[in-house]
Swiss-Prot record:
The name this protein goes by in its record: Protelomerase
Transmembrane intervals: none
Record region (Disordered): 535-575
Homology family: Belongs to the Caudoviricetes Protelomerase family.
GO BP: any one term: DNA replication
GO molecular function: DNA binding; endonuclease activity
EC number: 3.1.22.-
InterPro entries: ResT/TelK_cat, ResT/TelK_cat_sf, TelK_muzzle, TelK_N, TelK_stirrup
Bias (Basic and acidic residues): 563-575
Keyword Hydrolase: yes
Length: 617
């Protein structure tokens, strides 16, 4: 029997709920939790009866398995360990100096508990270092006050406690509290917060080691296969999008995706931060105060920090407000999540927007290998080249600190994977060209006198005036015979004749199928067409799976799985490329062969169906 991943997770949740509500002893419940998790992992990855010999071909990779486990654990993130309340009470009584802070962890939602616990651990860790400093002070004297003021700056979370040193002139009480805090820190590291099943929904040590080795190899490959990006071309293309008139964007995710991409490229923020969670306030022309960073397990973090903007900060704020004013974006902010949904709210939203945003990235770079998240690494590289050596803020920091703080990484090692892009033709004084010129409109005006003779009456003149009006409102407007026919209710042959006559002026060529396509694609921003940072192909491709693709993945959960069962061949489609409003380029692989199709279609689904029909029938 084959079932979808989403149903597999729902079944796991149902089983855990039944165990939790039963009147079994807690030890028996824990064993059953572990058994349910083991059954889930066997179905997805670990069953040796299915996944051996030829069956290994059907098994997902370690990277995907890790992602699936994470998705399964997310269904239990708002549940706490059964012993958590009792453990909190015990710890509170054992460490009276911190009793109130510890009690504050109880009776809170699980995500708040994790945030508060992390803050407390950070506070106590700084206290370990402070204890060493206090021990060297000796008897508190007026001359010691300067040292205490200095310590308050170094350890701001202990400022109130340090103030008592001056008033009491005795460090004994604070020393005792800090010593108690050191013991508490050890106790908190042993505290079980998560529900029992979450500890069982993890990889085996051998699989974790293999996954780490694979990630290390991928990072090693990336660092030796730098991708060169044309800096002027990148900045100019970003600027062109941000200066498009409002009318150039329709109220749909597909139409707004290039604008969201450009804003992410200018700020280095994640897609969810641009669309929903991020709060931005311009400090000066090139610095923005940012808060609302998306976090794993921590939902959205509070507080703000300063980031650079690659464009004028005020322009960034204006275009962001324009983007978020559209109903297609507002709907994401007010999305209702089904009660049985096993994804987090941010994951559900990412599932809606991932494909159009990644499509926008491929069109922007003119490179099918590029994806939306590349903007963060490129942004970090540009910011480094522009400000690291010139901004006094980084005078005493190395580049690892720069990348870590700019990208908002808690772990400084995380930024190691964000250095695979190299800027070509970089010049810190280079500025993009912002022009009001409208060359296509000017070229069309040169053809005004041709229109009366192109068709009977004033039909061609009316078409011509309408097209010029569209270009006057939006110089980048895409003009097709389909649009002309739809808006002016004219004959197909007349619309096609007009497009053929004005093709040069419009910057298009008419193909053998009668469809208009751009005269030439803009150059790829990846200057070395052989540059490829996609080693560990399996890992990279699977990281870009959409949530819907994960949900629809089928697993065989029957007891008599056979090595001889062979999966039915299915086509694997690359990201569709939109040539114009109704023209598509579709590429796919089937049975080991590559196929492509280009033509008109009402939607991307229609285009994919036509591509399949033309190549297979």
């Amino acid at each position: 029997m084959k079932i979808h991943f989403r149903d597999l997770v729902s079944g796991l949740v149902k089983e855990i709920d039944e165990i939790e509500k039963s009147d079994r002893a807690q030890g028996d419940k824990t064993r059953r939790y572990q058994g349910a998790a083991r059954k889930f992992k066997n179905a997805v990855f670990m069953d040796k009866r299915k996944y051996r010999g030829n069956g290994m071909k059907n098994r997902i990779s370690l990277t995907t398995f890790n992602k699936y486990l994470s998705r399964a654990r997310s269904r239990f993130e708002e549940r706490l360990h059964h012993s958590f309340p009792q453990s909190i009470a015990t710890i509170s009584n054992k460490y009276p100096a911190f009793s109130e802070i510890i009690k504050d962890l109880d009776n809170r939602p699980a995500h708040e508990v994790r945030i508060k616990l992390k803050e407390l651990i950070t506070h106590l860790e700084s206290g370990v270092n402070l204890l060493e400093k206090i021990g060297s002070l000796g008897k508190i004297k007026p001359s010691t006050a300067k040292k205490i003021v200095s310590l308050k700056k170094m350890y701001p979370s202990w400022a109130n406690d340090l103030d008592t040193l001056i008033s009491t002139e005795d460090a004994t009480e604070l020393q005792q509290k800090l010593e108690q805090g050191t013991d508490l820190l050890n106790a908190l590291h042993s505290l079980k917060v998560n529900h029992e099943v979450m500890y069982a929904l993890t990889m085996q040590p051998s699989d974790r080691a293999a996954l780490k080795a694979r990630h290390d190899a991928a990072l090693h490959f990336k660092k030796r296969n730098i991708v060169p990006i044309d800096y002027p071309g990148y900045m100019q293309r970003m600027t062109d999008i941000l200066h498009l008139p409002d009318i150039a964007f329709e109220d749909s995710m597909a139409s707004l995706a290039p604008l969201a991409f450009a804003l992410a490229a200018a700020s280095g923020r994640r897609q969810i931060e641009i669309l929903i969670t991020g709060e931005f306030d311009a400090k000066n022309k090139s610095i923005i105060k940012f808060s609302g960073q998306a976090k794993k397990r921590m939902a959205v973090s509070g507080g703000h920090y300063e980031i650079y903007s690659l464009i004028d900060s005020e322009l960034f704020i204006q275009r962001l407000e324009f983007l978020r004013s559209h109903s297609s974006i507002l709907r994401l902010q007010n999305l209702e999540i089904a009660h049985d949904e096993h994804r987090t709210e941010l994951s559900v939203i990412n599932g809606f927007v991932a494909k159009p945003l990644n499509d926008a990235a491929k069109q922007f770079f003119v490179d099918d290998r590029r994806v939306f998240k590349d903007t963060r690494a490129i942004y970090a590289r540009i910011a480094y080249e522009k400000w690291f050596r010139t901004d006094p803020r980084w005078a005493k920091c190395d580049e690892d600190v720069f990348f870590s703080e700019l990208l908002g990484h808690d772990d400084p090692d995380t930024q190691l994977a964000y250095k695979q892009f190299k800027l070509v033709n970089f010049n810190p004084k280079w500025t993009p060209n912002i022009s009001d010129e409208n060359p296509r409109l000017a070229a069309l005006q040169e053809l005004d006198n041709d229109m009366p003779g192109l068709a009977r009456g004033d039909a061609a003149v009316r078409i011509h005036e309408w097209v010029k009006e569209q270009l006057a409102q939006n110089p980048a407007a895409k003009i097709t015979a389909y649009q002309i026919k739809k808006n002016l209710n004219c004959r197909n042959d007349l619309a096609s004749r007009y497009m053929a006559w004005c093709a040069d002026a419009l910057g298009v060529v008419i193909g053998d199928d009668g469809q208009a396509r751009p005269e030439e694609l803009p150059p790829s921003l990846v200057l070395d067409i052989n540059a490829d940072d996609t080693d560990a192909e399996e890992d990279e491709i699977e990281e870009d799976f959409t949530d819907e693709e994960i949900d629809d993945t089928e697993f065989d959960v029957s007891d008599n799985a056979s090595d001889e069962d062979k999966p039915e061949d299915k086509p694997r489609f690359a990201a569709p490329i939109r040539r114009s409003e109704d023209s598509w380029l579709i590429k796919f692989e089937f049975a080991g062969k590559q196929y492509s199709w280009e033509g008109n279609a009402e939607s991307v689904i229609d285009a994919m169906k036509q591509a399949w029909t033309e190549n297979m029938e």
